[in-house]
Amino acid sequence: MTDTRKQRAAVILAAGKGTRMKSPLPKVMHAVGGRPMMDWSIALARQVGAERIVAVVHPSQDVLIAHLGKHHPDVAIAYQDPPQGTGHAVRCAEEALRGFEGDLAVLYGDSPLVPAATIEDLFGTLSDKTGLGVLGFEAEDPGLYGRLITGEDGSLEAIVEAREATPFQLRVRLCNSGVMAGRAADMFRLLAKVTNSNAKGEYYLTDLVGLARAEGIRCAVAVSGEDDLIGCDSKADLAEAEAIFQQKRRRALMEAGVTMVAPETVFLSHDTQIGADAVIEPNVVFGPGVKVAGGAQIRAFSHLEGAVVGEGCSVGPYARLRPGTVLAANVHIGNFVETKNTAMGEGAKANHLAYLGDGTIGAGANIGAGTIFCNYDGFLKHQTDVGEGAFVGSNSALVAPVRIGDGAYIGSGSVITKDVPDDALAVGRGQQITREGWARNYRAKKAAEKAARTTDQNKKG
């Protein structure tokens, strides 16, 4: 079957100052689910098949501009300076979309939770007769939201701001999200007719509805849930969006077979992957880039980021897995163990109080309590390799670069600076000296000294 769907493009509005965030960081660079809000909007545009994406930014947003250049080099950048409203912002993207003849969606860089299915529905309202679609939501408390006024046939007749609405219109709960889609050529042509004859002296995107209808272009409405369309203008909004995201992701994972003992205390990232029948205990934080296989157990108060956890592993409680950690099946990581850029083979164990950085640990190896991989010399990081079935005794320091051979034993309390062959024993510690009766004589001597000092002080007093 031939795909007759029109080409798609997206303009993402991100030039707002975000003064209510009270932060030097551009508003759209604040994160939800461990991901900048701008990245959520770019991902949304990609999910709905936008072949061309334009980010409208302010020239002063150096952090945002650098981020786009590094992580999204295919996203075109258009500058809005000074900001003069949403309609003006979209017009700033016109040059970047020169020659584009498909459908265009206008998205917002501070709305991180819009589902792709919702934008598909919005594009779906467009047809030969319907040239403009607006995304709305049924507000629990419409308040100051603009109202979407529809006709008997369901078409959109007007967007009315709350301050200009009649008492009858204020009873309407269908509100404007600001997200819009239409034929790109028509949208830019109509935008050229928008004026700034209003109290703020700005060019409003919402004016397109009246201009389109005046030309006989039908306008339509697609509806989404209110939570999906939350915009984040303040830290309070950001926290609300985070709570919505976490609740939805937790539920999705539990419905997929993940056990969460206290789900409200588990915090996930946008890309967290957890397999069926894994168990997540209370107060666990997943930073970006974590993949947990089925049957694994992540115990309480653990923090994972950039880590891969194999099937049947046990992690924690109070463990920290940092980026580059890869655990094969049935690995045990216990309390107060930190790993970074380290791979552990099947069945390897580090059950207590250890730092394992920049290393490999072979299958079945045992890392004793208090073991430290001394990986940093003040300038460079170095590698520690522990072979299969090796045993590292408690309170050992392995000074990298160093290799512990397969089946080798390291005596407790050792400082190891040289490679250890397979099946060898290495002990690097001071020799024990035992003096029988020394403690008894020492106590008697000190007791006498104390008594003499007390007698002398009494004479002086």
From Swiss-Prot:
<protein>
    <recommendedName>
        <fullName>Bifunctional protein GlmU</fullName>
        <ecNumber>2.7.7.23</ecNumber>
        <ecNumber>2.3.1.157</ecNumber>
    </recommendedName>
</protein>
<feature type="binding site">
    <location>
        <position position="369"/>
    </location>
    <ligand>
        <name>acetyl-CoA</name>
    </ligand>
</feature>
<feature type="binding site">
    <location>
        <position position="176"/>
    </location>
    <ligand>
        <name>UDP-N-acetyl-alpha-D-glucosamine</name>
    </ligand>
</feature>
<keyword id="KW-0511">Multifunctional enzyme</keyword>
<keyword id="KW-0808">Transferase</keyword>
<feature type="binding site">
    <location>
        <position position="429"/>
    </location>
    <ligand>
        <name>acetyl-CoA</name>
    </ligand>
</feature>
<keyword id="KW-0479">Metal-binding</keyword>
<keyword id="KW-0012">Acyltransferase</keyword>
<feature type="binding site">
    <location>
        <position position="366"/>
    </location>
    <ligand>
        <name>UDP-N-acetyl-alpha-D-glucosamine</name>
    </ligand>
</feature>
<dbReference type="Pfam" id="PF00132">
    <property type="entry name" value="Hexapep"/>
</dbReference>
<dbReference type="GO" id="GO:0071555">
    <property type="term" value="P:cell wall organization"/>
</dbReference>
<dbReference type="GO" id="GO:0016020">
    <property type="term" value="C:membrane"/>
</dbReference>
<keyword id="KW-0460">Magnesium</keyword>
<comment type="pathway">
    <text>Nucleotide-sugar biosynthesis; UDP-N-acetyl-alpha-D-glucosamine biosynthesis; UDP-N-acetyl-alpha-D-glucosamine from N-acetyl-alpha-D-glucosamine 1-phosphate: step 1/1.</text>
</comment>
<dbReference type="InterPro" id="IPR025877">
    <property type="entry name" value="MobA-like_NTP_Trfase"/>
</dbReference>
<dbReference type="InterPro" id="IPR050065">
    <property type="entry name" value="GlmU-like"/>
</dbReference>
<dbReference type="InterPro" id="IPR001451">
    <property type="entry name" value="Hexapep"/>
</dbReference>
<feature type="binding site">
    <location>
        <begin position="108"/>
        <end position="110"/>
    </location>
    <ligand>
        <name>UDP-N-acetyl-alpha-D-glucosamine</name>
    </ligand>
</feature>
<feature type="binding site">
    <location>
        <position position="161"/>
    </location>
    <ligand>
        <name>UDP-N-acetyl-alpha-D-glucosamine</name>
    </ligand>
</feature>
<keyword id="KW-0961">Cell wall biogenesis/degradation</keyword>
<feature type="binding site">
    <location>
        <position position="412"/>
    </location>
    <ligand>
        <name>acetyl-CoA</name>
    </ligand>
</feature>
<feature type="binding site">
    <location>
        <position position="80"/>
    </location>
    <ligand>
        <name>UDP-N-acetyl-alpha-D-glucosamine</name>
    </ligand>
</feature>
<feature type="region of interest" description="Pyrophosphorylase">
    <location>
        <begin position="1"/>
        <end position="235"/>
    </location>
</feature>
<keyword id="KW-0133">Cell shape</keyword>
<dbReference type="InterPro" id="IPR038009">
    <property type="entry name" value="GlmU_C_LbH"/>
</dbReference>
<dbReference type="GO" id="GO:0009245">
    <property type="term" value="P:lipid A biosynthetic process"/>
</dbReference>
<dbReference type="GO" id="GO:0008360">
    <property type="term" value="P:regulation of cell shape"/>
</dbReference>
<feature type="binding site">
    <location>
        <position position="322"/>
    </location>
    <ligand>
        <name>UDP-N-acetyl-alpha-D-glucosamine</name>
    </ligand>
</feature>
<feature type="active site" description="Proton acceptor">
    <location>
        <position position="352"/>
    </location>
</feature>
<feature type="region of interest" description="Linker">
    <location>
        <begin position="236"/>
        <end position="256"/>
    </location>
</feature>
<feature type="binding site">
    <location>
        <begin position="13"/>
        <end position="16"/>
    </location>
    <ligand>
        <name>UDP-N-acetyl-alpha-D-glucosamine</name>
    </ligand>
</feature>
<dbReference type="GO" id="GO:0005737">
    <property type="term" value="C:cytoplasm"/>
</dbReference>
<keyword id="KW-0548">Nucleotidyltransferase</keyword>
<dbReference type="InterPro" id="IPR011004">
    <property type="entry name" value="Trimer_LpxA-like_sf"/>
</dbReference>
<dbReference type="InterPro" id="IPR018357">
    <property type="entry name" value="Hexapep_transf_CS"/>
</dbReference>
<dbReference type="GO" id="GO:0003977">
    <property type="term" value="F:UDP-N-acetylglucosamine diphosphorylase activity"/>
</dbReference>
<feature type="binding site">
    <location>
        <position position="394"/>
    </location>
    <ligand>
        <name>acetyl-CoA</name>
    </ligand>
</feature>
<comment type="pathway">
    <text>Nucleotide-sugar biosynthesis; UDP-N-acetyl-alpha-D-glucosamine biosynthesis; N-acetyl-alpha-D-glucosamine 1-phosphate from alpha-D-glucosamine 6-phosphate (route II): step 2/2.</text>
</comment>
<dbReference type="GO" id="GO:0019134">
    <property type="term" value="F:glucosamine-1-phosphate N-acetyltransferase activity"/>
</dbReference>
<dbReference type="GO" id="GO:0009252">
    <property type="term" value="P:peptidoglycan biosynthetic process"/>
</dbReference>
<feature type="binding site">
    <location>
        <begin position="85"/>
        <end position="86"/>
    </location>
    <ligand>
        <name>UDP-N-acetyl-alpha-D-glucosamine</name>
    </ligand>
</feature>
<dbReference type="Pfam" id="PF12804">
    <property type="entry name" value="NTP_transf_3"/>
</dbReference>
